[in-house]
Amino acid sequence: MEVLPGLLRLLAALVVAERWARDTSGAESLGLWPLPFAVDISPRSLHLSPNNFFFGHSPTSKAGSSCEILQEAFRRYYDFIFGFYKWHQGSYQLCFGTELQQLQVHVESECDTFPSISSNESYVLHVKGPEALLRANTVWGALRGLETFSQLIYQDSYGTFTVNESEIIDFPRFPHRGILIDTGRHFLSVKTIFKTLDAMAFNKFNVLHWHIVDDQSFPYQSINFGVLSSKGSYSLSHVYTPNDVRMVIEYARIRGIRVMPEFDTPGHSRSWGKGQKDLLTPCYRKQVLSGTFGPINPILNTTYNFLSKFFKEISTVFPDEFIHIGGDEVDFDCWASNSEILQFMQEKGFSQISLNSNLCTVFKISNMISAMKKRPIVWQEAFDGRDKFMPGTVVQVWKIEDYKWEQSLITKAGFPVILSAPWYLDLISYGQDWKNYYEVEPQDFPGSDKERKRVLGGEACLWGEYVDATNLTPRLWPRASAVGERLWSHKDVRDIHDAYSRLTIHRCRMVRRGIAAEPLFTGYCNHEHRM
């Protein structure tokens, strides 16, 4: 990660002094989350007045007042800092002393349009009255710095908004820090997705993995194949219109979050078949049609003609460079029961008919995606140890059994990895299971340093069989926050007791901001008596 020019000496001094991410006394009391790389919080305090504080652009910033992303962020964070107490009749006073009147934001590059896997999210925060300074290479780093700045501010015993003089240098450990939501099993309203994106920004996640369709329903309203949702959705009101999709992408964009769509193939596709004739494989029982259908039919030209047109649409609707094409949990029995598929695969010389049918299908689709100047992501079943995928294909590891060995095999073959196996948040248990997620080390597997660097990051997955809008938010948060810190903070940030103290405060902060995050354990939030 590139660090801002002119700050390398300060960073080196912090590292030599071993102050980075280890002296957490101030961070613990404030609940900074995820913990920044380098934190130096002074006991000297500054006061803020809601009527006399504002965010502004540095005169030399290349992303100025015309940058909509920053202008929107200034409005959001002013409200996060002061708004709750306004609307809940909280009292605040301005005591004598130095007043912090402004946070100036300086961005080294012009206002970007969309974040990407290579976006620089580093920032430096210098808080000293009467003006604080936030410096970042990009607007995406500025957004992360604004979140940290908002976490520094608290109310003292007199109700005065207060911030301690601080120096913070920060950047993420991994570039891919995702949350997976599943709208194929249960439809989630756009409003619910917005709330998830808000919480993601509070925890510095930067990828919404949208598993948008599945066997049970097809809620994505295609521009070119509208019959897919009209026949495959739960109902005509359980669809995401093109405008809905645009709103989700835009809401995510101005928070520095990428939206990565997943359309799982060739399995998990029963809902597709309701609107696309001959797409699915007819299954047989004792050489007689059973009346059921299996995965996408891998031997018909019409299959690939349709998929090519469909994914061409997806590549234009979703601006992100990645498209997830699935490749997991394919019902091989149906393929093996179909004599036409058996004959086709035998003619191709495939010995493992079912496995090779899957690989053949996924390989063709991944080539389609690559031809569209996008990068495919697949689940680990699509990887068989051969370098058959296009360069740049990413493999997502989800099976908990031997997942470290799986990471080793994939990275040794030269492919990047996204880790999800230890972070399936839909698997709930009694107690503080967030600690299990927190203690995961994504690069702890047999391999060279070069191979470990192929880990792009990870995702916390919340599959939707038992999750809808009523329980999505409390099941995600603050359990996903543990994953967020593991993917953002330095690998040596592992003190579970310190994490508990900070996460307890951070959870209350999320609740104060409207996120129904469940409690970690017994206790209360300080803001409750004001409600």
From Swiss-Prot:
It catalyses: Hydrolysis of terminal non-reducing N-acetyl-D-hexosamine residues in N-acetyl-beta-D-hexosaminides; N-acetyl-beta-D-galactosaminyl-(1->4)-beta-D-3-sulfogalactosyl-(1->4)-beta-D-glucosyl-(1<->1')-ceramide + H2O = a beta-D-3-sulfogalactosyl-(1->4)-beta-D-glucosyl-(1<->1')-ceramide + N-acetyl-beta-D-galactosamine; a ganglioside GM2 (d18:1(4E)) + H2O = a ganglioside GM3 (d18:1(4E)) + N-acetyl-beta-D-galactosamine; a ganglioside GM2 + H2O = a ganglioside GM3 + N-acetyl-beta-D-galactosamine. Disulfide bonds join C67-C111, C283-C334, C508-C525. The gene is HEXB. GO terms for molecular function: beta-N-acetylhexosaminidase activity. The active site is at E329. Keywords: Cytoplasmic vesicle, Disulfide bond, Glycoprotein, Glycosidase, Hydrolase, Lipid metabolism, Lysosome, Signal. Belongs to the glycosyl hydrolase 20 family. One of its GO terms (cellular component) is lysosome. Addition of GM2A stimulates the hydrolysis of sulfated glycosphingolipid SM2 and the ganglioside GM2. The keyword Plastid does not apply. It comes from Sus scrofa. GO terms for biological process: carbohydrate metabolic process; ganglioside catabolic process; glycosaminoglycan metabolic process; N-glycan processing; single fertilization. The keyword Glycoprotein applies. Its EC number is 3.2.1.52. It is found in: Lysosome; Cytoplasmic vesicle, Secretory vesicle, Cortical granule. There are 3 forms of beta-hexosaminidase: hexosaminidase A is a heterodimer composed of one subunit alpha and one subunit beta (chain A and B); hexosaminidase B is a homodimer of two beta subunits (two chains A and B); hexosaminidase S is a homodimer of two alpha subunits. The composition of the dimer (isozyme A versus isozyme S) has a significant effect on the substrate specificity of the alpha subunit active site. Residues 1-21 form the signal peptide. This is Beta-hexosaminidase subunit beta. It is an enzyme of class 3 (hydrolase). It comes from the Eukaryota. Hydrolyzes the non-reducing end N-acetyl-D-hexosamine and/or sulfated N-acetyl-D-hexosamine of glycoconjugates, such as the oligosaccharide moieties from proteins and neutral glycolipids, or from certain mucopolysaccharides. The isozyme B does not hydrolyze each of these substrates, however hydrolyzes efficiently neutral oligosaccharide. Only the isozyme A is responsible for the degradation of GM2 gangliosides in the presence of GM2A. During fertilization is responsible, at least in part, for the zona block to polyspermy. SUPFAM superfamilies: (Trans)glycosidases (SSF51445), beta-N-acetylhexosaminidase-like domain (SSF55545). Glycans are attached at N120, N164, N301.
